[in-house]
């Protein structure tokens, strides 16, 4: 394959998944800037390894899973190097970047409802569970694609999703105590 053909195929098959790659990196690193660095590094790695990619135009999800595997591995390497940085990312920041598209009014309302509560619940999940939920619920990967991307058996993916969802359900259904400052208007 010529360099021009490699670049063309890469742009057609891999580049459309840039937003998904960025979203996954954002959830893992908890920082927009670090996610950008991770994605840049992952795309360089993907381009270097692209000749070994065996996907085709008929199976674009395979390209997404292949790329997200690289992004995940790059993110994990970043995480090992920067574990003590303490970076945090707000839930609203972890959603699709508003520069990518304009949400409709219904979507704005849904996103704003209980945003902080959901963010806090997701933050409490162990990385393995959070990663599985992000790949499934936000990026739309199948169980098999998650299995390939994360490098664990299909049963482990199913278990992580089930346990992660149960954990989220428990966190979100626990009654919250009012902070005295928050309850000031309820006399």
Each language-model region and where it sits:
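Arg/Lys-rich amphipathic alpha helix in sigma70-family domain 2
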Residues: 51-54, 68-90, 103, 111
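A short pre-motif secondary-structure segment
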Residues: 132-136
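A short, charge-rich alpha-helical start-of-domain segment used by transcription regulators
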Residues: 1-23, 33-39, 47, 51
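Helix-turn-helix DNA-binding motif, specifically the short coil turn and the N-cap/start of the second
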Residues: 31, 142, 151-156
């Amino acid at each position: 394959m010529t360099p021009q053909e490699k670049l063309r195929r890469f742009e057609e098959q891999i580049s459309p998944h840039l937003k998904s790659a960025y979203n996954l990196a954002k959830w893992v690193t908890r920082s927009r800037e670090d996610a950008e660095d991770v994605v840049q590094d992952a795309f360089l790695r993907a381009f270097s390894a692209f000749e070994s990619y065996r996907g085709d135009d008929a199976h674009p999800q395979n390209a997404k899973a292949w790329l997200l595997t690289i992004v995940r591995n790059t993110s994990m390497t970043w995480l090992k190097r920067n574990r003590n940085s303490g970076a945090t990312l707000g839930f609203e920041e972890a959603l699709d970047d508003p520069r990518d598209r304009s949400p409709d009014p219904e979507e704005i309302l849904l996103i704003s409802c209980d945003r902080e509560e959901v963010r806090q619940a997701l933050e409490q999940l162990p990385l393995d569970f959070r990663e599985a939920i992000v790949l499934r619920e936000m990026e739309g990967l199948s169980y098999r694609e998650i299995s390939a991307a994360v490098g664990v058996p299909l049963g482990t993916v199913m278990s992580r999703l089930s346990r992660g969802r149960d954990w989220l359900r428990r966190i979100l259904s626990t009654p919250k105590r009012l902070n005295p400052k928050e309850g000031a208007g309820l006399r």
